[in-house]
Curated annotation (Swiss-Prot):
Subcellular location: Membrane
Coiled coil (residue ranges): none
Protein name: 23 kDa piroplasm membrane protein
Cytoplasmic topological domain residue ranges: 225-229
Segments passing through the bilayer: 204-224
Organism: Theileria parva (East coast fever infection agent)
Signal peptide (residue range): 1-19
Amino acid sequence: MNKYFKVFFFVLLTHALKSALIFGQATLQKGLSLDIDKDSKATDRLVVKHFDSDKQGYKAYTFKKEGWEYVNVKHVYFGERLLRVGRDQDMKCDYVHYVKVFWKGELAPFLIKMKYYNWAWVSTRLHFRLTPELTWAEVFVPTIDENSEEGYMKLFKKRMDDFVSQVGEDRLATYKPFTEDPSKKRFDLTPTDEKEDTNKKKYVLMVVVVVVFVVVASLVVFLVKFCLK
C-alpha cells in the first residue's frame, strides 16, 4: 500500500508542477502595460494589444481607454524588410502617416493606403489619437523593373517620399496647430516591465500548489492509516 501511494503521490506532484509552469508561461502573453497618470491622484493601468499581419505587411500597437483610441505607428513592416515612418527620434510635426502595403497577386505594383492621426498629449510622442473623420488616400505605385529588387525599392522609396511630401503640404495648408488646453491633464506614459512581476506570480503559484498538495496528501495518508487500523 505504501509503495503504490508513493507512486501516486509522485505522479500527482509532477502533474501539479507541470500545470503551474504552463499557467505561468501563459500569463507572459499579456503585452506591454502602461501607467497613465491623468489626475495626479491615481495611476490607471491598461494593456496594449498587439496586431500583426504579415500578409498586409504592417504592425501596429493600439489601445483604448475611456473613449480615447491611440495607435503607435512608428514602424511599418514590409515582408522581412523594415520601413520607417517618420524618424527614429521624436516626431517634428503634429501629424503622422500610417501606411499599409498590399500585394496584388504576383504583380509588382502595389497599393498604399494612408491615414492621418493627430498627435495628442503624450510625452513619448509615439502615440497618436485617432481621427475617424479623415478618409483613406489610395495610391497606385508602378515599378521600373519588377525583376529588380534594387530598382523596385528605389522607386518605392522615391514615390513614398514624394507622396508623403505632397500630402503633408496639402494637409499643413489647412492644418490648425494643436493648442494646449490648461483644463486637461497631460497624458504621461511610462512602460512597465510585466515579465518580472509575472515570474514572481508564477513561482508564488507553484509554491501554493505544492503546499496545498502536500497538505492534501498528508490528510489522505492519515485517513488511509486510520482506516487500516
